[in-house]
Every structure is written in structure tokens, then in C-alpha cells.
């Protein structure tokens, strides 16, 4: 009984000192809400993440080799957040964002905030200010490797700057993490891969910017290009594999494959065909695909073409796939589900 009184007294003192809600029992009727998620634009990846997308109010890291689809995936997330009326910002440290490509993926350029900072400190200060404002829902930093410390920029070429970027990232993570949670703003860091020297056994790959981001990120996605999609002799896209390397909100280590078509982004209809067959929603007999009593095409490309031409059927298939995985039917506020992009 004395312990219960002592605990009650301690809780009351903490609430007086730090405000109501600063400490509470997790299962009690409290303002702790279910984790909100924003769709990635890929139905398969939404399912693999376990909550229907990337969690809001968290730090996310997306890394992979060059031209693997890192920026494409993040632009799809931006487009999905904008569909829900969210405010998005893109911190383009690489100075390489293609506005026309972003527009093709569904990004509203008129509503997108963009910054092209000169130094790493400036970039992270901009991120911190936007997060603390509480008015921004999603911030993308492209990329961690391009967040060059001011001391390195002002120094001579060839000067040794041991660990300066890692120190910068470590300080930024400590400063950002609390305000990101309070403002419910998602911050996505795109990262590049480097090779460790002298690794005989194990994976020699590592990401730039030290270890701080690995610890603070709630979700880490490893994205890789696995093959080419050809139309006769022309390469028209890539098959892409994403592995959920770390996930604090659902079981990790799930993998998903989807197509990224050049100039169009993630092929949603291709995913509906593949995931529909896996979920038993779409039947495959030989090379023929059918939905219900209706044949939708001979061969995968013809089935994709049918779904592009029949968005109602595609919407029904998507709803049934989501339902089979226990996900919400729609990710938009209008309750009509995601818009199908012709891909």
C-alpha cells in the first residue's frame, strides 16, 4: 500500500513539474493513439510494413545503391500525403530533384515546399524549424551523404575531416527526435551505400553519416534493382526489391517486389495482379488471369492493361487484397481508396 501511495505522489509531482500527460499508464484511457500511417504508393510495401504504410511522427531511412528507386519511392509517399491534404517539404541537398518527374508521379508542385541548402548544418536547421512549426506533415531529406559539414566546405580539398558528418547527424538526431514525435511529422532520410575497407567476412556495405540514424530510425528500408523490364529490345522499367531491415511498429524482415516503370513510377496494376494471385483474389490458370467469372487477360501485361482500362475492377481487387491482410480499405480522407495511376 505504501508503494502505491509513493507512486501516486511521484506521478503527481511529475505532472505538476512537467505538465499533464507527461507520464501515464500505457493501457489507460489516455491520448495515446494508434499509429497513423501514410501509404508508400506500393500496395505490397504497405502490407509488408504491417500498418498500411510508413508511420507518422517517426524517422525513416531509405537506402540503396545508385538508381535503385530511392527518390521515386519517397516522391510516391509525398504524393500520397498530399492526397490526404498534408503539407510536404523536400530538402534537396543533392540539388538533383527533377520537378517534371515528380509531377508525373502525382506530386503537386504548387504545394510542395523545396529547399536546396548550401551546408549540412543549414539543411538540418531548416528541417528542425519545419518540424517545430507543427504545420508540416512530411519532410524528405535527399540525401544524408550530401549533408556536408560547413568545416569541410570551407576547408581545402584533401583536408582530413574525420567523423565530422557523423557528429553532425548524431547531434541532429538528438535534437530532432522529441519534436518529431510531438508534431506527428514524418521525416524521411534518403541514404547512400559505401563499402567498408578490409572486410573479409560478412557484408562490407554500410550507410553514410555514422550510426546515429540507424538507432533513431523507426523504419529502415533497403531498396535494390533486381532486373530490367523490356519491351522487345527497349528497357522500359526495373523490377525492384525492398526489404524492411528495421521496423519498430510491426514485425521486420519482410520483403516485397514491384515494378518501377521509367517516367511513371511504381506500377500499381502490376502489383494488383501479383498480390491478387497470392491472396487468391485473382485466379491464374496457365497463362490466363481471371477475376470472378471474368477473364482479365492472357499473360501478365494483358492483365495489367485490362486493370488500367477498368479502374472499378482494379479498385475491387485492391479492396479485397487489403481486407485479406487486415488493412483499411482506403488511405485517403474521401474514403474512396487510393487513386489508380495508369502504369
Curated annotation (Swiss-Prot):
Keywords: ATP-binding, Cytoplasm, DNA damage, DNA recombination, DNA repair, DNA-binding, Nucleotide-binding, SOS response. It holds the Pfam family RecA. The keyword DNA damage applies. One of its GO terms (cellular component) is cytosol. One of its GO terms (molecular function) is ATP-dependent DNA damage sensor activity. It is found in: Cytoplasm. GO terms for biological process: DNA recombination; DNA repair; SOS response. HAMAP family: RecA (MF_00268). This is Protein RecA. It comes from Cereibacter sphaeroides (strain ATCC 17023 / DSM 158 / JCM 6121 / CCUG 31486 / LMG 2827 / NBRC 12203 / NCIMB 8253 / ATH 2.4.1.).
